């Protein structure tokens, strides 16, 4: 009931780390991050992911963003009073194939979300029993072909959950 949306703009990877730290309740004073005593957000949601890990020279799950995500998700990791935050990321759009999950969604402590299909049926009138979006019913509730898949490079099964991402 008291949920609020806290938008944080991140145009490059450094902004992402600053945004996560700030949202998790840390304040930057003279380039030193200290916990303020209360997170500004309980859940941080990222609708993005980086698919092409060779550019980062590290394996997804062991890259800097994934490691920071894991640390911020762990209670008492950066301060004795720090409760941790839940960080959710899109699984990415690297498509079908084994181990296409990228970063930071390959973090072992983050929650990654993959995409499934949905064909909601119209139950009335001339369109009774027809898919709402004009698709056929054969591909209902399947993993979307563009959705990234696991396992992560460190062996974690990913994505952690699936939700409607296409019609």
Model-derived features: where do they sit?
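Loop-rich non-cytosolic ectodomains and luminal regions
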Residues: 1-167
């Amino acid at each position: 009931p008291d949920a609020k949306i806290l938008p944080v703009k991140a145009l490059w990877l450094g902004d992402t780390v600053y945004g996560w730290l700030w949202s998790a309740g840390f304040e930057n004073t003279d380039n030193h991050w200290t916990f303020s005593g209360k997170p500004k957000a309980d859940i941080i949601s990222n609708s993005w992911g980086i698919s092409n890990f060779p550019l980062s020279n590290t394996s997804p799950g062991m890259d800097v963003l994934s490691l920071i995500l894991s640390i911020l998700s762990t209670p008492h990791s950066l301060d004795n009073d720090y409760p941790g935050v839940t960080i959710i990321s899109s699984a990415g759009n690297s498509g079908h194939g084994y181990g296409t999950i990228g970063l930071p969604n390959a973090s072992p402590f983050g929650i990654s979300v993959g995409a499934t299909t949905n064909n909601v049926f119209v139950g009335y009138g001339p369109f009774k029993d027809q898919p709402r979006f004009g698709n056929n019913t054969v591909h209902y509730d399947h993993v979307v072909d563009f959705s990234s898949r696991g396992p992560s490079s460190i062996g974690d099964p990913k994505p952690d959950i699936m939700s409607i991402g296409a019609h």
